[in-house]
Amino acid sequence: MSDASGPLQPDRPEADVPFRVEAPFDPAGDQPDAIAELVAGYEQGAQQQTLLGVTGSGKTNTVSWVVEELQQPTLVIAHNKTLAAQLYEEFRSLFPDNAVEYFVSYYNYYQPEAYVEQTDKYIEKDASINDEIDRLRHSATRSLLTRDDVIVVASVSAIYGLGDPRNYEEMSLRVERGQSIGRDQLLAKLVDLNYDRNDVDFTQGTFRVRGDTVEVYPMYGRYPVRVEFWGDEIDRMAKLDPLEGTVESEEPAVLFHPAEHYSVPDAEMEQAIERIRTDMHERVRHFERTGDMVAAQRIEERTTFDLEMMAEAGYCSGIENYSVYLSDREVGDAPYTLLDYFPDDFLTVIDESHRTVPQIKGQYEGDKSRKDSLVDNGFRLPTAYDNRPLTFAEFADKTDRTLYVSATPGDHERAQSANVVEQIVRPTHLVDPDISIADATGQVEDLMDRIDERVARDERVLVTTLTKRMAEDLTEYLEEAGVAVEYMHDETDTLERHELVRGLRLGEYDVLVGINLLREGLDIPEVSLVAILDADQQGFLRSETSLVQTMGRAARNVNGEVVLYADETTDAMQAAIDETQRRRRIQRAFNEDHGTTPTTIEKAVGDMNLPGAETDTADVAGDAPSDEQEAALLVEDLEARMEDAASNLEFELAADIRDRMRELREAFDLDGGDAPEDPGGVAPETEDW
């Protein structure tokens, strides 16, 4: 496994290491043809292609083999942190000798700055930053600027503003053994890079001094570096074990990158401060002309305070709102983002593109609408608008080769792709489930008979309904009929959801009822029947895409079957049925031609990588505290657990704990409990980006 901290030497001799996949198996099924078609398409000049891969066909492995063939730095974007974490682990195992990095929002908790005009209430930005994820973000940008064999797995955070990569690279400090530099001179340079001196709490982004020895903990690294001086010359450098303090290796040279992505050289900071001050005075005059003296005073006081902090420390809270001044951009120009740290020629993989593309498209307008009231009421200068995510057009302009990956590509992907390459035949040779339509009248009685058949074969059943009330009533009915059944609803937290899946797999119950069973973690080999009630009703959960996705839940069992209960066959139903039957024909023909026999996927229950399954979650949703003091202690305990969960990449669990903390703060009127969930109605969920 590659060292996530990366080597320390600035020359990076391993920068020429080629991408090489290490997998326990060779491409199979449709994978060899898909890999060859995609690679040929790019080599022939295609800029955008789509990999249409059915559930369980090994799309991630196919993407990996394509990367190996193209030998290009690669950005992989997922639509939430949890999926990004899963992909990160998969790519790390497939590319053990290359730099596989992880770039998502570093917030455990995030309440965006906002102003609610109706109640004249200003809400300060409130955030809890996860230091480990911050380290991983810096590791990603460092790798992109110092080596070629890089894969970055990211959430939509990849399109949000980041510092100028040229400043980040040019301000980097190269230190070599034998170099003539005084100890105090090195300390001053580290401060310029926004490193903090801390002789007690020695963590990433800090340094400490012990006589003629300086120890620096790089922002991106897992190991601190000891620099020993002999007079005004560096005598020795070593990488240290962070716990024992013992020497891991001697280092001839070290390259320190800034501790903040928004780091700016002193001369440029002075120029930026003057430009900000000029714009502030213009904004004050604007408010005075319109008679809004409160806003005029507010923008002057707030901006002046920020300028004083920037002049003194080179940084201020909310410095991202001044990002346009800290680079060579003009107002309205696209912000610098993670994409600008990539070389000109790189591959972008958009995973689950039918969900990720709409998410990318929606970020810009959502961010702008929240800032309107802040700018209009003097809380921020208009240039705060330039601290924003990319528009979709800007995103498309900054990317080069693009590969959309989905079992159900959307209209955008199909329209933009030069080729839609299908991966229909699975390496396991399983075929898509058989589909039947049953009358909605008497659907529950029919379902009971089908459940009995599955129980007799020690198989499992998923049932999806349209409403919470119907799911509850059906669960109650099945229980009274003696069926071992559980119900998964929108309030089921992360750990409970995974425990439900685990219990279903172990046979603790036979049927799982839910409303939206498209979520990750529900690819269960033991499920041989998916029952879709009220399949002919219009709506998102009964669209062609959703139906195909739901049908795929039965695609990992050789006896897989889907039953649609409906009074009529809608266009969405027919399209989903036609597509599934088309895939079945292709899969069965392949099996007949090659003499292969499909078998149910065998996967030990313990092999399921369930975020949060091994985390102590006692009291997360336990008994309510009796008074404010108990509540405050519980919130403090929960906050520590939230940070631990996020550090372990268990983001859904961290989100559940965050929500419990909000409930306690509101119920007992603790600090931070009076902020609305999202005043502008547009802030992205922390676990999404």
From Swiss-Prot:
Main location: cytoplasm
InterPro entries: Helicase/UvrB_N (IPR006935), Helicase_ATP-bd (IPR014001), Helicase_C-like (IPR001650), P-loop_NTPase (IPR027417), UVR_dom (IPR001943), UVR_dom_sf (IPR036876), UvrB (IPR004807), UvrB_inter (IPR041471)
Chain positions covered by the region annotation Disordered: 1-26, 668-689
GO biological process: nucleotide-excision repair, DNA damage recognition; SOS response
Cellular component aspect of the GO annotation: cytoplasm; excinuclease repair complex
CDD domains hit by this protein: DEXHc_UvrB, SF2_C_UvrB
Residues spanned by motif Beta-hairpin: 106-129
Alphabetic keyword roster: ATP-binding, Cytoplasm, DNA damage, DNA excision, DNA repair, Excision nuclease, Nucleotide-binding, SOS response
Domain Helicase C-terminal stretches: 443-605
Binding site for ATP: G53, V54, T55, G56, S57, G58, K59, T60
Compartmental location: Cytoplasm
PROSITE patterns in alphabetical order: HELICASE_ATP_BIND_1, HELICASE_CTER, UVR
Entries under Pfam families matching the protein: Helicase_C, ResIII, UVR, UvrB, UvrB_inter
SUPFAM superfamilies found in the cross-reference section: C-terminal UvrC-binding domain of UvrB, P-loop containing nucleoside triphosphate hydrolases
Molecular function as annotated in GO: ATP binding; ATP hydrolysis activity; DNA binding; excinuclease ABC activity
Function description: The UvrABC repair system catalyzes the recognition and processing of DNA lesions. A damage recognition complex composed of 2 UvrA and 2 UvrB subunits scans DNA for abnormalities. Upon binding of the UvrA(2)B(2) complex to a putative damaged site, the DNA wraps around one UvrB monomer. DNA wrap is dependent on ATP binding by UvrB and probably causes local melting of the DNA helix, facilitating insertion of UvrB beta-hairpin between the DNA strands. Then UvrB probes one DNA strand for the presence of a lesion.
Subunit: Forms a heterotetramer with UvrA during the search for lesions. Interacts with UvrC in an incision complex.
Domain notes: The beta-hairpin motif is involved in DNA binding.
Family: Belongs to the UvrB family.
Protein name: UvrABC system protein B
Protein source organism: Halobacterium salinarum (strain ATCC 700922 / JCM 11081 / NRC-1) (Halobacterium halobium)
Gene: uvrB
